[in-house]
Every structure is written in C-alpha cells, then in structure tokens.
Amino acid sequence: MAVITMKQLLEAGVHFGHQTRRWNPKMKKYIFTERNGIYIIDLQKTVKLIDDAYDFIKDAASDDGVVLFVGTKKQAQEAIEEEAKRAGQYYVNHRWLGGTLTNWNTIQKRIKKLKEIKAMAEDGTFDRLPKKEVALLIKQRDRLEKFLGGIEDMPRIPDVLFIVDPRKERIAVKEAQKLNIPIVAMVDTNADPDEIDVKIPSNDDAIRAVRLITSKMADAIIEGRQGEDDAPVTEDTFENTDDQVDSIEDIVEVVEGDNDSTDAE
C-alpha cells in the first residue's frame, strides 16, 4: 500500500507545478500535462517516488542516522521545525549559514557560544551584569538561536538531508554534494532533479503539500527507530477514503475544475 494516496496528494495540491515559462526541461519526465499555463506533475510517479523516499529515510533512521530537515522559505518553516522535532531530528528553517556542513567545526563554536549565553541566563549571571551588556548578550543569543537553534544538539554532520525547494537551498545542496551526503528533496517543475539523490516531484510552494510530505518523512524516521509495529499516525495526514483517485485521467478532471486555486506561480 502506498505511503500517500493520489487522493491525498490532490487534496494538498501536490500536482500543481510552476508556470510553463518557469521550468527546467530535466523535469519533463515527471510532468503529466499543462493546463492554463501551469505544468501538472504526474502524481502516479510521485506516489511511487514518495514510497522510495520513505523507505530511504526509514532505513537511514533504523541505522541511527542523523537526518537534517531544511526549508527556509516561509511556506516550509513551520512544518520543517515541527516535523523535525516530532521525529527527534534537526532542522534549519531560517537562512542557511554558509559552511553549516563544510565548516562544521566553526559552526560548533557558534553553537557553544549559544549554549554559554543560555547558561548565563539560567544560572543568574545576567543578574550580576550591567543592563547594556545583558541586552547585547540577549540580542546575540536570539540571533544564534534563530539560525542555529535547530541544530544546537545535532551530534555530528547529518547522514541525510531532507530539503524543501533545493533551488532555494542551493548552498545546502552544494555542501551536501561536497561531503557526499545523500539528499531527499521535494522537486518542483523548475528544479534540477539531477542534483538530488532521492527525488519527490511535488509542488514545493503550497503549505499543505509541504506539510503532507514533510510529515511523511518524519513518520519514516519514527518507524525506522521504533519498528513497523509502532508505525506512527499523524494528525496532519489527510484521511483515506474509499473514493480514491487512482488514474491520471481523474487528475486532469480535477485540475481543469480547480486550476485557479493553485498556490504556484
């Protein structure tokens, strides 16, 4: 049974790609058709590739792999943080700092500074310092927390990256490639799939689409850690019903009637 059904993907708007003038020809094999100037992603392929991504992430988690969730665009920030935390993993949901992976030693020094300032706030040190100095420390702490809080407790360089919108996160992609870290990513019709190890053709702009797929990657981690008997059920997952959409022709019918509701541009 598929990890996500075609009906769930349709309800989340996963099938809506970008405008036809904004595409990468390498994504052609993942595109079913074009409607009203919008590319429509072939969800039959997406269903299968989500299964592949799920198994890949699950296998990594079962080997105690560290998974880093990356998504800094507004539509992804909340889901990236919440699902990474739910899976007991790590995340970057604001600006990716250059060298996060390739200069890990320097990043660790910044994380150490963040922890030191937090300790000062908790052990009463702030009470003994001038107000101006405390204000500066708080400002520094908040900035470090914003960019590094999601990887503060990451024990080592991750074994896998899950990325929403690899075009936007191109620096993270390049760093992972340099270190031979496999990438699982949601690739929209304007992305280069050749840069990604495990591809999920998907709308990466719609909040519901991002949430649905990100939550499934978190489920894969939890299942990998716990075993199949404890496979998780998420509240955010769309409900399965008997009236499953199971043909590409049905997709076209839905698209023709619903194309105006797309989030993609």
From Swiss-Prot:
Family affiliation: Belongs to the universal ribosomal protein uS2 family.
HAMAP family referenced in this protein's UniProt entry, alphabetically: Ribosomal_uS2_B
Disulphides: none
GO BP terms: translation
UniProt-listed CDD domains: RPS2
Lineage, uppermost ranks: Bacteria, Bacillati, Bacillota, Bacilli, Lactobacillales
A GO cellular-component term linked to this record: cytosolic small ribosomal subunit
InterPro entries reported for this sequence: Ribosomal_uS2, Ribosomal_uS2_bac/mit/plastid, Ribosomal_uS2_CS, Ribosomal_uS2_flav_dom_sf
UniProt name for this protein: Small ribosomal subunit protein uS2
PROSITE patterns: RIBOSOMAL_S2_1, RIBOSOMAL_S2_2
Keyword tags: Ribonucleoprotein, Ribosomal protein
Cross-referenced Pfam families: Ribosomal_S2 (PF00318)
Annotated organism of origin: Ligilactobacillus salivarius (strain UCC118) (Lactobacillus salivarius)
PANTHER family reported for this sequence: 30S RIBOSOMAL PROTEIN S2 PROKARYOTIC AND ORGANELLAR, SMALL RIBOSOMAL SUBUNIT PROTEIN US2M
GO MF annotations in UniProt: structural constituent of ribosome
Annotated Gene3D superfamilies: Glucose-6-phosphate isomerase like protein, domain 1 (3.40.50.10490), Helix hairpin bin (1.10.287.610)
